[in-house]
From Swiss-Prot:
Stated name of the protein: Argininosuccinate lyase
Single GO BP term: L-arginine biosynthetic process
Keyword Cytoplasm: yes
Catalyzed reaction equations: 2-(N(omega)-L-arginino)succinate = fumarate + L-arginine
A Pfam family this chain is assigned to: ASL_C2
Matching HAMAP family: Arg_succ_lyase
Length: 477
């Protein structure tokens, strides 16, 4: 390759007699994934120019020229008129080239004073992540809202609740749907907590030791929407725990979506028959005409593994790096950008899928008592009559054994069979051997009784609204 000067898409060159080999450049180039930082490069460069002016390193005229050039560069990036060239090493070199093209090397070449790619990229990446996770949070609230809307539409529907994937106790369908909304809300809580650590600006840290040019990192941090400037320049330029934490939060969100997806996949099978998928959110088979496949749910389940891989790969990259900056850290962006991209595909698709599900509530109600799911109610009825739970548990289990041997439900046992198990099992026990009674009786906070589930839904809706407001507010107002 020809001489690789600092005005040709790279930010270094004077110390070298020639440019890198083709293989070296191919390994080093990063514009194919770091170009997402270009709009943030403009914002940070404008803030940096103002600080250079305050430090009397830029004249009034040069500042005005530079800001105008950066504004034009930002517009050209936004509308696609300016982009990276094959000779650009990274987004930073490309953007400097673009600025110099617009304002000339005398003014454009002054912008780099007091900053390094090390503090620059750490700052821009944080800015991008802060915006990206707000979009993810907003999309997550929409999925929560879809679950809540289905819960409201089926407030009285009863279904089999399961543990170990076996029949356990009857619950409200709304209760089950809101049980998927809760972890999604916690995922947004994690995003908001993560943002506290993202909101620290590395700008002004230089390569690792800070700057001798009397710059003002706090002013840049404030203009860019950060809460503070970094306390330690070595840490600020070389740490990527914010990236691995982001990867974890996004992977956890994907895992929570995958659990919902798994239930949808099971529920739409003929064996369950709980739901029917909308044609708009399912696919067919190339050979079997009857098929209606839950591809949205399956892709959600599959892509969750991809996000877990992004997390583990990033952790492996970070685990043994000495201080301060190392080029390994170029590998921090692709896994995060990919995880964000996958969630931006999955969230609207899962929201559409959930909001258009048709529930077969009669089928769910029919199966709710199957598997002797009222056995606990029988035992707790005995407890209310003063029987120790250990004895009540034994008696209820004996009733299940008899009913199972006869192929009937608990309520179908005769009075003689009940009293034969335990004389304290009087005919009045039949009052609790209904799925409606079982559901209504579980009225503790968080329980499946209708009144409690309505309270849960109200809290879910309030939390979702608050999270959406936070996400829409943005970082830089």
């Amino acid at each position: 390759m020809e001489q690789h000067g600092t005005n040709e898409g790279a930010l270094w060159g004077g110390r070298f007699s020639g440019g890198p080999s083709e293989a070296m450049f191919a390994l080093s180039v990063s514009t194919h994934f770091d170009w997402v930082l270009a709009p943030y490069d403009v914002l940070a460069s404008k803030a940096h120019a103002k600080v250079l002016h305050q430090a009397e390193l830029l004249s009034d005229e040069d500042l005005a020229t530079m800001l105008a050039g950066l504004d034009q560069l930002g517009k050209d990036v936004a509308d696609g008129a300016f982009g990276p060239l094959p000779s650009d090493e990274d987004v930073h070199g490309a953007m400097e080239r673009g600025l110099i093209d617009r304002v000339g090397p005398e003014v454009g070449g002054r912008l780099r004073a007091g900053r390094s790619r090390n503090d620059q990229v750490a700052t821009l990446f944080r800015m991008w992540v802060r915006d990206a996770v707000r979009d993810i949070a907003l999309g997550t609230t929409e999925l929560v809202d879809a679950l809540s809307a289905q819960a409201k539409a089926h407030a009285d529907a009863i279904m089999p609740g399961k543990t170990h994937f076996q029949a356990a106790q009857p619950v409200l369908l709304a209760h089950q749907l809101l049980a998927h909304a809760q972890p999604l809300l916690r995922d947004i809580d994690r995003i908001r907590d993560l943002d506290k650590r993202l909101a620290v600006s590395p700008y002004g840290s230089g390569a690792l030791a800070g700057s001798s040019l009397k710059l003002n990192p706090e002013a840049i941090a404030e203009e860019l929407g950060f809460d503070s400037a970094a306390d330690n320049s070595i840490d600020a330029t070389s740490s990527r725990d914010f990236a691995s934490e982001t990867a974890f939060v996004l992977a956890q969100l994907a895992v929570d979506m995958s659990r919902l997806a798994e239930e949808i996949i099971a529920w739409c099978t003929p064996e369950f028959g709980y739901i029917t998928l909308s044609d708009s959110w399912s696919t067919g088979s190339s050979i079997m005409p009857q098929k209606k496949n839950p591809d949205v749910a399956e892709l959600t389940r599959g892509k969750s593994g991809r996000l877990i891989g992004n997390l583990t790969g990033l952790l492996a990259t970070l685990k043994a790096q000495p201080l301060a900056y190392n080029r390994d850290l170029q590998e921090d962006k692709e896994p995060i950008v990919d995880s964000v991209a996958q969630l931006n595909l999955l969230l609207p698709a899962m929201t559409g899928l959930v909001s258009t599900l048709t529930f077969n509530t009669e089928r769910m109600r029919e199966l709710a008592p199957a598997g002797f799911t009222l056995a606990t109610d029988l035992a707790e009825w005995m407890v209310r009559q003063g029987v120790p739970f250990r004895e009540a548990h034994e008696a209820s289990g004996a009733c299940v054994r008899i009913a199972e041997s006869r192929g009937v439900d608990l309520i179908d046992l005769t009075d003689e069979e009940l009293s034969g198990v335990d004389a304290r099992l009087t005919p009045e026990v039949r009052e609790v051997l209904t799925i409606d009674g079982a559901v209504a009786s579980r009225a503790t906070r968080g329980g499946t009784a209708g009144v409690r589930v309505a309270e849960q839904r109200a809290r879910v809706d309030a939390a979702s609204t608050a999270h959406a407001e936070w996400a829409r507010a943005g970082v830089r107002r």
